[in-house]
UniProtKB/Swiss-Prot annotation:
Belongs to the UPF0213 family. Gene3D superfamilies: GIY-YIG endonuclease (3.40.1440.10). Pfam families: GIY-YIG. This is UPF0213 protein BLi00048/BL00536. Residues 4-79 form the GIY-YIG domain. It comes from the Bacteria. CDD domains: GIY-YIG_UPF0213. It comes from Bacillus licheniformis (strain ATCC 14580 / DSM 13 / JCM 2505 / CCUG 7422 / NBRC 12200 / NCIMB 9375 / NCTC 10341 / NRRL NRS-1264 / Gibson 46).
C-alpha cells in the first residue's frame, strides 16, 4: 500500500558529510538512523541531523531526486539545496527530532 507522501532527504553527519536517502516517514527514518539501525554509512557517523527534505506524491519521483542528487559533487549538492530552499521547497517537520 502506497502512502501519500514520499520524501527524498539529506542528513548531515557528525563528520560533516552528507547522506541522501528515500523514506515515506521522515520522523521514523531519522530515529532509525540515530538509533544505529539505519544505513551502514550513517552508523559510523552518528549523530545525524535532517539537513534537507523534499516531499513528492510518488515513490518514483522521490527516488529519482535521490538518484540525481547522489551523482552531484559536494559543491553542487549544496547549490541544489540552496536553490530549492530559495524556491520554498525544503520540507520542515513539525518538530525537531
Amino acid at each position: 500500500m502506497e502512502t501519500n507522501s514520499h520524501y527524498f532527504y539529506v542528513l548531515s553527519c557528525r563528520d560533516g558529510s552528507l547522506y541522501a536517502g528515500y523514506t515515506n516517514n521522515i520522523e521514523k527514518r531519522l530515529k532509525t538512523h540515530n538509533d544505529g539501525k539505519g544505513a551502514k554509512y550513517t552508523r559510523a557517523r552518528l549523530p545525524v541531523k535532517l539537513h534537507y527534505a523534499e516531499c513528492f506524491s510518488t515513490k518514483r519521483e522521490a527516488m529519482q531526486a535521490e538518484y540525481y542528487f547522489k551523482k552531484l559533487s559536494r559543491k553542487n549538492k549544496e547549490r541544489y539545496i540552496e536553490e530549492k530552499r530559495r524556491e520554498g521547497v525544503d520540507y520542515q517537520p513539525a518538530k525537531e527530532f
